[in-house]
Swiss-Prot record:
Subcellular location: Cytoplasm, Cytoskeleton, Microtubule organizing center, Centrosome
Organism classification: Eukaryota, Metazoa, Chordata, Craniata, Vertebrata
Protein name: Proline and serine-rich protein 3
Keywords carried by this UniProt record: Coiled coil, Cytoplasm, Cytoskeleton, Phosphoprotein
Broad class of the protein's primary localization: cytoplasm
InterPro entries per UniProt: PROSER3
Positions where Phosphoserine occurs in the chain: 408
One cellular component term from this protein's GO annotations in UniProt: cytoplasm
Positions with biased composition (Low complexity): 38-50, 67-83, 134-147, 211-237, 255-279
Coiled coil: 419-451
Length: 480
C-alpha cells in the first residue's frame, strides 16, 4: 500500500468530499470513525485534559486551531497538528435551548461548571408558593416567565453561565428570605391571637368555677341563676356576653366584654373565698360539734347515766364501765350492749353517728334514769323514742365478739395489760349475768304463782307489772 495515499478513501471518509492530491499534503493519522457525534466539545474534553482551559479563550481562537490553507491550493497544511487538535477542528455546535427543557438541562450539564445543590436548587418554598402573602409581589406566571428568561440559551464558554447562575441564585435567595420572614411574622401573629383567646377563655372558666364554688353555700337562688353563654366550638371567639335574668327587668345583654388581648392583660378580680363571704354556721363546724359532744360525754360520765358514746379518757372510761356494770338491768340485750361499749383488741366497732346539739339535749332529757339491779322496772322494755337501739348488724357483730371472748380460754396475750383489764371485766359481767338470770327465773316463778291466785271480788285486779314492782322494791329493801 502506498504511504502517500490516505487510509480512508473518498467514499469511506466521514468528512465528505475533500480534494486529494498535492505533494505538500500530509495526510492525517488513522482515526476511529464513530457513526454519530452528539457533542464535539464533550469528546474533546474526554481526550484532552487541557481542553476546558483552551475553550475558555473562545472557539475561534488561533491558539487552538492552527490549520493553514495555502492560497495556491485548496488542501490544508497541518505541519504540527495532533490527533486531538485535528478532532477538535470543527467549532462546537450547541443545541438550541428553545427546543425543549431537556435540551436546556443537557446544555447546562455540558457547559456549566459544577455548582452546589443550594445554588442550583434553593431549599424551601419558592415565592410563587406564597403569592397570597405579598400584595406587592408580581403574578406567579410572570415570575416563572422571568425565571425562564434568566436561564441562558446559548453558552459559548463557561465563564458567563457561572456568573449568570450565581446571580440568579442570589436573586432567588433574597425573595426566599423575605417570604420566610413574612411567613414567620404571619404565624407569630396568628399564634398570639390564638394564645390570647385561649387564655381569656381559661380565665373566664376559672372565674366561673370560683364563683360557683363560693356561691354554693352563700348565694341565693336568684343570684345563682347568673350564667354566661359558652364560647364557640373552636375556642377562638374573643368576645362573650353575660346575661342576668331578673323578674323586674327584662332580659337584656350587658355591654360586650373587651377583646381577648385587653381581657387577658387586665383580668377582672376573682371573687373572695367562701370563708370570707359567709362564715360557717355552728352546726356545720366540726370543731364545734366535737366540743359539744365532749361536753355531753363528760356530763353523762359524771352523772353515771347510760352514755351512748363512750368517753375518750381511759380513766373516765374505766369509771363509767364500773358504774354501768352496777346500774345496768340484768337483761341479755343489755349485756350485749355492754360488750359493744367495751373495746376489743381483735376488732373495732363502728362509731355511732353524732347528733346535733338540739337532738343531743333531747336525748339526754328523754333518757330514762338508771335502774337498780333487780328492780321490776328493769324487766319492762324501754320506750322506743327514748332508747337509741343499735342496728341489727351491730348487735350481730357484738354477739360474735362476745361468743369469741367466751370461747377463749384467756391464754393468748397474757402480758397485755389491756387484755387483762378486759378479761377482768368479762369475768365480772359473766358473774352478774348469772345472778341476773337466777333472779329473773325466781321473779318469773313468783309471777306465775301470783297469776294462778284469784283476787277477791271487791278489790280491783292487779297487773303483773305492779306486782313485779312491789316484789322488786321488797328485794331492794332486803338487799340494803
Amino acid at each position: 500500500m502506498d504511504r502517500s495515499l490516505p487510509v480512508f478513501s473518498i467514499q469511506d471518509s466521514p468528512f465528505g468530499d475533500a480534494p486529494l492530491g498535492r505533494s505538500h499534503y500530509w495526510p492525517s493519522q488513522s482515526q476511529t470513525w464513530c457513526p454519530k457525534t452528539l457533542s464535539p466539545s464533550r469528546s474533546q474534553r474526554s481526550r484532552l485534559p487541557q481542553a476546558p482551559k483552551a475553550l475558555a479563550t473562545g472557539p475561534n481562537s488561533p491558539e487552538l486551531f492552527e490549520e493553514s490553507w495555502p492560497s495556491s491550493s485548496g488542501t490544508p497544511s497541518l505541519p504540527s497538528t495532533t490527533e486531538g487538535q485535528m478532532w477538535a477542528s470543527p467549532a462546537p455546535t450547541l443545541i438550541d435551548s428553545g427546543d425543549s427543557v431537556v435540551a436546556k438541562y443537557i446544555n447546562r450539564f455540558r457547559q456549566a461548571q459544577p455548582t452546589s445543590r443550594e445554588e442550583r436548587q434553593p431549599a424551601g418554598p419558592t415565592p410563587a408558593d406564597f403569592w397570597w402573602l405579598q400584595s406587592d409581589s408580581p403574578d406567579p406566571s410572570s415570575q416563572s416567565a422571568a425565571a425562564g428568561a434568566n436561564k441562558p440559551e446559548g453558552r459559548p464558554h463557561t465563564a458567563v453561565p457561572t456568573a449568570v447562575n450565581v446571580t440568579s441564585a442570589s436573586h432567588a435567595v433574597a425573595p426566599l428570605q423575605e417570604i420566610k420572614q413574612n411567613l414567620h411574622t404571619w404565624n407569630s401573629s396568628l399564634l398570639d391571637l390564638e394564645t390570647l383567646s385561649l387564655q381569656s377563655r381559661a380565665a373566664r372558666l376559672l372565674k366561673r368555677s370560683k364563683a360557683s364554688i363560693s356561691s354554693s353555700s352563700s348565694l341565693s337562688p336568684s343570684d345563682a341563676s347568673t350564667s354566661s353563654f359558652p364560647t364557640s366550638s373552636d375556642g377562638l371567639s374573643p368576645f362573650s356576653e353575660t346575661f342576668i335574668p331578673d323578674s323586674s327587668k327584662g332580659l337584656g345583654p350587658r355591654a360586650p366584654a373587651s377583646p381577648a388581648p385587653a381581657q387577658a392583660q387586665t383580668p377582672t378580680p376573682a371573687p373572695a373565698p367562701a370563708s370570707s363571704q359567709a362564715p360557717l354556721r355552728p352546726e356545720d363546724d366540726i370543731l364545734y360539734q366535737w366540743r359539744q359532744r365532749r361536753k355531753l360525754e363528760q356530763a353523762q360520765g359524771s352523772k353515771g347515766d347510760r352514755a351512748w358514746v363512750p368517753p375518750l379518757t381511759p380513766a373516765l372510761r374505766t369509771l363509767a364501765e364500773s358504774l354501768k356494770a352496777k346500774a345496768l338491768p340484768p337483761a341479755a340485750g343489755s349485756v350485749i350492749r355492754k360488750s359493744e361499749a367495751t373495746p376489743s383488741p381483735g376488732a373495732c366497732l363502728q362509731p355511732e353517728v353524732p347528733l346535733s346539739p338540739a337532738e343531743q339535749a333531747t336525748t339526754v332529757k328523754a333518757s330514762p334514769p338508771a335502774f337498780q339491779v333487780g328492780s321490776p322496772e328493769a324487766l319492762a322494755p324501754p320506750p322506743p323514742a327514748a332508747d337509741h337501739a343499735p342496728s341489727e348488724a351491730l348487735l350481730a357483730q357484738a354477739a360474735l365478739l362476745l361468743q369469741a371472748a367466751e370461747d377463749s380460754d384467756g391464754s393468748e396475750f397474757q402480758d397485755d395489760p389491756v387484755l387483762q383489764v378486759l378479761r377482768a371485766h368479762r369475768a365480772e359481767l359473766s358473774r352478774q349475768k348469772r345472778e341476773a338470770d337466777a333472779r329473773l327465773s325466781f321473779l318469773l316463778d313468783q309471777a306465775e304463782d301470783l297469776g294462778s291466785w284469784s283476787p277477791p271480788a271487791g278489790s280491783p285486779p292487779r297487773s303483773p307489772r305492779r306486782l313485779l314492782r312491789r316484789e322488786g322494791d321488797s328485794l331492794e329493801a332486803r338487799r340494803l
